[in-house]
């Protein structure tokens, strides 16, 4: 809560715990022409790809230890562009593929033996993500509309699922007797 200003105390609230990860988005690119390495099996209907290269910043960390089930990202920009990007991510992505080395094939959910393709999801619509408290007798849609008009930026978060692959497990360095882990990976969001 804030100190009172003209007798009014403001309450501040977050809907989710913040996880700070030792990661950096090193590069993000969008391509209409797909140039996947040999051995990559793309889903049928792919027309473009959004590639996000992530760097692991901590020498002690491993990908398996820092990557959550989903990587929550905030879409920042001009409102109409954010809207189009959110639509593309949450409605047009066919799969999230991982590339551990620059010239190696992209690994899809099929090649990893996962039961279904991974797709980004919208954040901010669940009851446990509410910013405003409403009477339980009120319809959830009323809360969502109120929050959308009062806090539209709250809905600019997207969870990008990260496939768990064996190549991301490894030792932090060669000194501990293991194989050195790759310090960068690329997530390829293939779009229809």
Where are these regions (language model features)?
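Intrinsically disordered, low-complexity, polar/charged repeat-rich segments
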Residues: 1-192
């Amino acid at each position: 809560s804030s100190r009172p200003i003209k007798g009014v105390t403001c309450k501040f609230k977050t809907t989710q715990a913040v996880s700070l990860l030792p990661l950096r988005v090193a590069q993000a690119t969008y391509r209409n022409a797909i140039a996947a390495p040999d051995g990559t099996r793309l889903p049928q209907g792919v027309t473009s790809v959004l590639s996000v290269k992530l760097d692991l910043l901590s020498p002690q960390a491993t990908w398996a230890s820092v990557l959550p089930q989903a990587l929550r990202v905030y879409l920042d920009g001009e409102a109409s562009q954010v809207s189009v990007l959110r639509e593309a991510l949450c409605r047009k992505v066919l799969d999230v593929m991982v590339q551990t080395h620059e010239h190696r094939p992209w690994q899809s959910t099929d090649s990893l033996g996962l039961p279904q393709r991974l797709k980004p999801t919208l954040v901010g619509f669940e009851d446990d993500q509410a910013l405003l408290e409403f009477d339980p007798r009120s319809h959830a849609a009323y809360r969502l509309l109120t929050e959308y008009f009062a806090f539209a930026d709250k809905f600019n978060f997207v969870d990008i699922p990260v496939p768990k692959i064996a190549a991301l497990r490894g030792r932090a360095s060669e000194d501990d007797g293991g194989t050195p882990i790759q310090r960068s990976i690329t997530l390829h969001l293939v779009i229809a």
